[in-house]
Swiss-Prot record:
Belongs to the OMP decarboxylase family. Type 2 subfamily. HAMAP family: OMPdecase_type2 (MF_01215). The active site is at residue 96. One of its GO terms (molecular function) is orotidine-5'-phosphate decarboxylase activity. Signal peptide: none annotated. It catalyses: orotidine 5'-phosphate + H(+) = UMP + CO2. This is Orotidine 5'-phosphate decarboxylase. NCBIfam families: pyrF_sub2. Keywords: Decarboxylase, Lyase, Pyrimidine biosynthesis. Pathway: Pyrimidine metabolism; UMP biosynthesis via de novo pathway; UMP from orotate: step 2/2. Gene3D superfamilies: Aldolase class I (3.20.20.70). Its EC number is 4.1.1.23. The gene is pyrF. GO terms for biological process: 'de novo' pyrimidine nucleobase biosynthetic process; 'de novo' UMP biosynthetic process.
Amino acid sequence: MNKQQLFENIKKKQSFLCVGLDTDIKKIPQHLLSEEDPIFAFNKAIIDATADYCVAYKPNLAFYESLGTKGMMAFEKTVAYLRENYPDQFIIADAKRGDIGNTSEMYARSFFDHIKVDAVTVAPYMGEDSVKPFLIYPEAWVILLALTSNKGSHDFQMTEDANGERLFEKVLKKSQEWANDEQMMYVVGATQGKMFLDIRKQAPNHFLLVPGVGAQGGSLAEVAQYGMNDQCGLLVNSSRAIIYADKTEAFANVAREAAHAVQKEMAGYLHDKGIIPCKA
């Protein structure tokens, strides 16, 4: 999916919501545990319930890898289900990969040749040669970690050099030599608030993947105010606040209501920016 297609889908659905599939076997409704594949059964129900109100899904690989072969099979089945039934959805593998060139090449093959996601999150710490193998796929996206939502982000990402330039700003500046805004996005945590103004000075046209809204306490209003550009430029992720909104047999319907509430708020911000003609 290219940038224009993503933007058109945002306008069509009046939403820039990404639903995070951080599926924890210990947190899904008890009645699903009798299913042959409880993780996939949960994901399928969440997807069917929320697809009308979001433009992207983001499975977090750690939750699937922790279950071994069965977990990875559930992940691959989830991606295949999305591809077959919801081809307009942007699929992000939240894997935070990044290693020396030949290792990154294998990671890229796994996600883009085999599993066929649209994007993968990548850590930039090892530099250009660890990122480039992901960029040889012209239809795929790299989502580079820039300024994350966790408290520990201040340990490195906010440190300044002698000229006052912060590390995350170096990442933004240098990485734009590797790819343009048609193939690269950045992870910026919702808890960073007004830092979006600084981000947009460095990356005015890039899409930003924004975790941290919902259970982590980030403000959607603040993200939209400071981070939205003329093509929206945002994919705001919500995981726990949607997928674990309820643990009874009604969990999917409650998740749908939670996603719809976020979508309606997003439609207002898109309208205020002049991206869509009227509120949903």
